[in-house]
Amino acid sequence: MAAHDDDMNRGIRPGRGSDDPSGQIAYLEQEIAVLRRKLADSPRHTRILEERIVELQTNLAGVSAQNERLANTLREARDQIVALKEEVDRLAQPPAGFGVFLTANEDGTADIFTGGRKLRVNVSPSVDLEELRRGQEVMLNEALNVVEAMEYESVGDIVTLKEILEDGERALVQGHTDEERVVRLAEPLLDITIRPGDALLLEPRSGYVYEVVPKSEVEELVLEEVPDIGYEQIGGLGNQIEMIRDAVELPYLYPDLFKEHELRPPKGVLLYGPPGCGKTLIAKAVANSLAKKVAEVTGQAQGKSFFLNIKGPELLNKYVGETERQIRLVFQRAREKASEGTPVIVFFDEMESLFRTRGSGVSSDVENTIVPQLLAEIDGVEGLQNVVVIGASNREDMIDPAILRPGRLDVKIKIERPDAEAAKDIFQKYLTERLPLHTDDLGEHGGSKATTVQSMIQTAVEHMYAESEENRFLEVTYANGDKEVLYFKDFNSGAMIENIVGRAKKMAIKDFLDKNQKGLRVSHLLQACVDEFKENEDLPNTTNPDDWARISGKKGERIVYIRTLITGKQGADTGRSIDTVANTGQYL
């Protein structure tokens, strides 16, 4: 259109020198018309251009977003390729091995043990050679160089320590099949005290032991503690307590006097007597008293002693040699404790169950090896101080004579059944003024608790020890035909007195709950005596009355017949024959 206008303009444009005004006017009018048309078309062109610009901007934004997405996709693809390459490289690497660090060398190398071989290898700069410890596990690369430090081994075999060798870095141990082996001590064991008998964790390939496993066979059979029982808590055994204190405490407290008089301290003490009369109680009080005496001598606030309470029947083992080994471990522990200057009591309760007379066995001859083992250990105590063996038994006639001879169990103390005076003393341990007493009983004695308690004890003891018709218990017939009537007092014990007081206390509690009458009464004690006697009516119910009589403290002529003289709770008939057996050695 512009070109057409230009042609038209050129066609109607007057010449340069034209003087025709009308022509010039026509030309100008045409110019004006053209300009007006151009002016009218200008907004439309502007709008078209603006729309085009917006369209181009929209296209540009879409292209930019697409370009960003492509860039992100490329980056993700690159990361995946890198990760896959690393995974491929990792999977293509040879496996890493493990070894045990032995020692570091001056040139920066290390000696290790791996694959059954001892090697000297290089150490990666990332590993601090000075931080590696004996027995520590290390990681190795394909060239068998140390590239990483690991932890100590935590699994392996259990072995028993026999002794530590002179260099302090090796030890002699024993495996479960009794084979002996020399092993190295890992760094953690060099800083702690280990003792023979401890269970250790062994890594068998490298020969290192790493830790003490909290499982010692001796601990399962030994109660290593100081009991809190004092002599003042034991009633009716004043003479026996004095004898055992002379045998146990004097040699420890006054060793110079014994040496001056050339007097050898006793190696052992045997406490024998019927059940429930205080044998175990005295043994526990010995350890407690020794601890207090140690404190007095040394000036310490609290003394220390050890009481190794051997659970005799649990010491027996069906495997040959196991019981003997356990006995050796027990005395090994005792020697170790005694070497520290601490008194040690090795207490064998129910001694006849372990150390029967050799040759008395029927189904086995285990005593033929157990007894010599104990004899060897007791004789070994001679060179040690502060170790005393105490045995307790109610069948001392079954213990091997070699154990009972002087020089082994030197002191033999019989723990008798309590008489009336001893029974009063025992009652006073359990029946005290601290207990609530019934107002009626207090009123009979002017409100005095002390007088009331003494009266209750006196009444109970008189009832227990009266040779009355109601206290008749047994009629025994001896082998020579003699007969004897035994009363309940003949079978009394400290344990029975404690049980009687316990019954009376329970009756007082029940009376308070039922009748709202608080306090212990003498009638409770008397009824408790009757109930206790009735519960013991089945005592002689055994196939061997002679063995039963020996355990109960009746020694002497052999008993062949027992007849009960008390009617049972269910009205059982009295007078039953009890047959004897030929072999009396296997009762226990």
UniProtKB/Swiss-Prot annotation:
GO CC annotations on file: proteasome complex
Pathway membership: Protein degradation; proteasomal Pup-dependent pathway
InterPro entries: AAA+_ATPase, AAA_ATPase_domain, ATPase_AAA_core, ATPase_AAA_CS, NA-bd_OB-fold, P-loop_NTPase, Prot_ATP_ID_OB_2nd, Prot_ATP_ID_OB_N
Function text: ATPase which is responsible for recognizing, binding, unfolding and translocation of pupylated proteins into the bacterial 20S proteasome core particle. May be essential for opening the gate of the 20S proteasome via an interaction with its C-terminus, thereby allowing substrate entry and access to the site of proteolysis. Thus, the C-termini of the proteasomal ATPase may function like a 'key in a lock' to induce gate opening and therefore regulate proteolysis.
Keywords (A to Z) from UniProt: ATP-binding, Chaperone, Coiled coil, Nucleotide-binding, Proteasome
Protein name: Proteasome-associated ATPase
Gene: arc
Domain of life according to the entry: Bacteria
Family annotation (PANTHER family): AAA-FAMILY ATPASE, PROTEASOME-ASSOCIATED ATPASE
Organism for this UniProt entry: Streptomyces scabiei (strain 87.22)
Molecular-function annotations in GO: ATP binding; ATP hydrolysis activity
Matching HAMAP family: ARC_ATPase
Quaternary state and interactors: Homohexamer. Assembles into a hexameric ring structure that caps the 20S proteasome core. Strongly interacts with the prokaryotic ubiquitin-like protein Pup through a hydrophobic interface; the interacting region of ARC lies in its N-terminal coiled-coil domain. There is one Pup binding site per ARC hexamer ring. Upon ATP-binding, the C-terminus of ARC interacts with the alpha-rings of the proteasome core, possibly by binding to the intersubunit pockets.
